[in-house]
């Protein structure tokens, strides 16, 4: 009986988890002949007469594909927690890049101005440009987070749309330190990285933080000792991760 009860509990927990993620509605960005999958979480107790913040989340390379599901592996459950939905009620958007695409430029490790952004990033920007025009969106509270490849994409989209975002949290990412002038003094940024990351060197985040400071910005920087590439788990467990993000508005300075 105890063994049966255990399996029933496991089944219920797993089922509840799947049910939670199903709250992210499956959608598709369509622009001319191009398409891009995304999942979207509607604000709790949605009221069309209210204006809600928007949180864009860019996944890592391992979550690319066309299943419109893998991009929810990391981060999606954070926004589903009851206390977070109540305290930080917002639109949450998880686009999914195809297997052969990136959240940056066509060459994922080239960030220069003369390199065109990837098709996936181009579609996300087109989508966001339109989405934030909605009457139920607070344009002063649009945020972007990303991990690994998505951390790189976070720096890229800040450069391409510096007037869109009120705060950014790149996790274990990378970027071009020569491209920070567009956003360094405009956007509060909290950078995360694990000291033992062998996939994306923590020196990349240090490089970006230094460049932002040199350009007049004041980034918040958190490094985790003895943590590898999955520093996003630590970042999501920061007590004030969402609180810090939602405290930022384009109406106020850093």
Regions found by a protein language model. Name each.
Residues 61-121:
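Active-site machinery of serine-nucleophile hydrolases
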Residues 171, 188-254:
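C-terminal catalytic histidine-bearing segment of alpha/beta-hydrolase fold enzymes
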Residues 129-185:
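Primarily recognizes the serine-hydrolase "nucleophile elbow" in alpha/beta-hydrolase
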């Amino acid at each position: 009986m105890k063994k049966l009860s255990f399996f029933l509990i496991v089944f219920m927990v797993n089922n509840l988890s799947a049910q939670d993620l199903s709250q992210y509605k499956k959608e598709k960005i369509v622009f001319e002949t191009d398409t891009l999958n995304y999942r979207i979480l509607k604000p709790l107790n949605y009221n069309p007469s209210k204006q809600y913040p928007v949180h864009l989340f860019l996944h890592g390379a391992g979550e690319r594909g066309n299943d419109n599901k893998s991009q929810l592996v990391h981060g999606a459950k954070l926004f589903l927690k009851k206390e977070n939905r109540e305290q930080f009620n917002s639109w949450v958007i998880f686009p999914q890049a195809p297997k052969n695409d990136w959240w940056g430029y066509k060459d994922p490790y080239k960030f220069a101005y003369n390199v065109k952004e990837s098709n996936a990033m181009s579609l996300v920007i087109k989508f966001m440009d339109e989405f934030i025009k909605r009457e139920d969106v607070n344009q002063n509270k649009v945020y972007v987070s990303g991990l690994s490849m998505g951390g790189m994409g976070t720096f890229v989209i800040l450069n391409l749309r510096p007037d869109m975002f009120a705060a950014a949290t790149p996790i274990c990412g990378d970027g071009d330190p020569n491209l920070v002038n567009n956003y360094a003094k405009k956007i509060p940024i909290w950078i995360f990285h694990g000291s033992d990351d062998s996939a994306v060197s923590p020196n990349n985040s240090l490089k970006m933080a230094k460049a932002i400071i040199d350009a007049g910005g004041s980034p918040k920087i958190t490094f985790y000792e003895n943590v590898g590439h999955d520093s996003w788990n630590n970042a999501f467990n920061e007590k004030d991760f969402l609180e810090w993000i939602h405290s930022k508005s384009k109406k106020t300075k850093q």
